[in-house]
From Swiss-Prot:
Signal sequence annotation: 1-43
Domain of life: Eukaryota
GO biological process: G protein-coupled receptor signaling pathway; negative regulation of vascular associated smooth muscle cell proliferation; negative regulation of vascular wound healing
Residues bearing attached sugar chains per UniProt: N113
Keyword Nucleotidyltransferase: no
PANTHER family the record matches: CHEMOKINE-LIKE PROTEIN TAFA-5, CHEMOKINE-LIKE PROTEIN TAFA-5-RELATED
Protein name stated in the entry: Chemokine-like protein TAFA-5
Disulfide bridges in this chain: none
A GO CC annotation given for this chain: extracellular space
Subcellular locations according to the entry: Secreted
Function: Acts as a chemokine-like protein by regulating cell proliferation and migration through activation of G protein-coupled receptors (GPCRs), such as S1PR2 and FPR2. Stimulates chemotactic migration of macrophages mediated by the MAPK3/ERK1 and AKT1 pathway. Blocks TNFSF11/RANKL-induced osteoclast formation from macrophages by inhibiting up-regulation of osteoclast fusogenic and differentiation genes. Stimulation of macrophage migration and inhibition of osteoclast formation is mediated via GPCR FPR2.
Amino acid sequence: MAPSPRTGSRQDATALPSMSSTFWAFMILASLLIAYCSQLAAGTCEIVTLDRDSSQPRRTIARQTARCACRKGQIAGTTRARPACVDARIIKTKQWCDMLPCLEGEGCDLLINRSGWTCTQPGGRIKTTTVS
């Protein structure tokens, strides 16, 4: 009778080093931690990219991209010059100043064509933001 192929010893079994269960538990926990940390909490935002162009005199053009995890009825916007989740109605009606985009002490005015807003500082400096 020929020997059963299942009872024979495998030659490649010793090729892999033995790893303890502690190692695998650590690897699983590390991967879960990485997956958990890459997700935002509901109602929060983070800046992903920020580019500044100061090639023109007396003018700086800044572009930023934010990633938000907004709740139902909210959409990514700006509050106090930071990315934030705001009421979707504000974006639909283009009433930008309703989301309080300017810093405290600054005045907010809509652009004539409602394509953005301006924040006027007490000293007269004006920051213009357009929405794309």
